[in-house]
A protein has these predicted regions:
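Extended, compositionally biased flexible segments
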Residues: 2-122
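Internal alpha/beta scaffold segment
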Residues: 122-138
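Single conserved hydrophobic/aromatic residue that forms the stacking wall/gate
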Residues: 139-147
């Protein structure tokens, strides 16, 4: 696993790509030894950067829940990600497409939290108690890095 400095550098690279609306070279091409654990560490650092800029963590999503999607992504289990306040759009509202680089629509599960989850050892009951509600999510993912 990479060190925290490397995770921070990668998160900053993705953050800059998002801000400049420019697709960059795939992270895995520059870091072929990157692991799933590294990817989640980069995600945590990216979320930290966004919160420092004033965004709010509102929930989490679970993706790749079907075996077919896992197989197509060469991943053997569902993945998860953060949902920030500016990622929510009300039914019928316009989504500003100019904020995306290469948008794709994905169907995922969203856990909207009533209170934060803490620590790496959260139990099923911790998640249940922190969850305000669970919804089916049409998630607009964006590719800051080329695949």
């Amino acid at each position: 696993m990479f060190d925290k400095h490397t995770h921070t550098l990668i998160a900053q690279r993705l953050d800059q790509a998002e801000k400049q609306r420019e697709q960059i070279r795939a992270i895995s091409l520059d870091y072929p030894e990157i692991t799933i654990e590294d990817a989640y560490a980069v995600q945590r650092e990216w979320v930290r950067l966004k919160i420092a800029e004033g965004r709010t963590l509102k929930g989490h999503k679970i993706g790749l829940t079907s075996k077919a999607m896992q197989a197509s992504s060469q991943i053997s289990e569902p993945d998860y990600g953060a949902l920030l306040d500016d990622m929510f759009f009300h039914d019928g509202s316009d989504i500003p497409t100019d904020r995306f680089i290469v948008p794709r629509i994905e169907v995922e599960l969203a856990f909207v939290l009533a209170k934060p989850l803490r620590g790496p050892n959260c139990t099923l009951f911790d998640v249940y108690n922190a969850t305000d509600y669970v919804i089916c999510l049409l998630y607009t993912s964006d590719a800051a890095d080329a695949k």
